[in-house]
Amino acid sequence: MVSRDFGREKRLLIPRQFKAVFDSPTAKVPGKHVLLLARPNALDHPRLGLVIGKKSVKLSVGRNRLKRLIRESFRLNQDSLAGWDIVVVARKGLGELENTEVTQQFGKLWKRLARSRPQTAVEAAGSSHA
């Protein structure tokens, strides 16, 4: 089981990591006012990057609220997301949703992304012998 913390190792931190996901996402999960881009990583845990610009959400209070909600939702659902580098791209209107709506929407988005989860090396090796 993946630990439920959200430490530095579970974040996309440098531009090169974001660029890798933007340049070649293997999964795109659109939602209401948001887009998830994901790419497999070779790690046993997922990593999250957030792109919430001023064009999408004008006030910093709103941007920070969304970041907190998205990070918390990710933290609670990360066991099913192992093996992904994920970038969340906010679109206009996301800041106008209530906290419960944002939380529910991301719960559904994580589930949709988990269904298209890449096989780990262990799973791939096991299925080739069957």
Curated annotation (Swiss-Prot):
Similarity comment text for this entry: Belongs to the RnpA family.
Gene that encodes it: rnpA
Full protein name: Ribonuclease P protein component
Single Gene Ontology MF annotation: tRNA binding
Subunit field text: Consists of a catalytic RNA component (M1 or rnpB) and a protein subunit.
Lineage: superkingdom: Bacteria
Pfam families in alphabetical order: Ribonuclease_P
NCBIfam families to which the protein is assigned, alphabetical: rnpA (TIGR00188)
Reaction catalysed by this enzyme: Endonucleolytic cleavage of RNA, removing 5'-extranucleotides from tRNA precursor
One Gene Ontology biological process: tRNA 5'-leader removal
GO CC terms, sorted: ribonuclease P complex
Protein purpose: RNaseP catalyzes the removal of the 5'-leader sequence from pre-tRNA to produce the mature 5'-terminus. It can also cleave other RNA substrates such as 4.5S RNA. The protein component plays an auxiliary but essential role in vivo by binding to the 5'-leader sequence and broadening the substrate specificity of the ribozyme.
InterPro entries tied to this protein: Ribosomal_Su5_D2-typ_SF, Ribsml_uS5_D2-typ_fold_subgr, RNase_P
EC id: 3.1.26.5
Keywords of the record: Endonuclease, Hydrolase, Nuclease, RNA-binding, tRNA processing
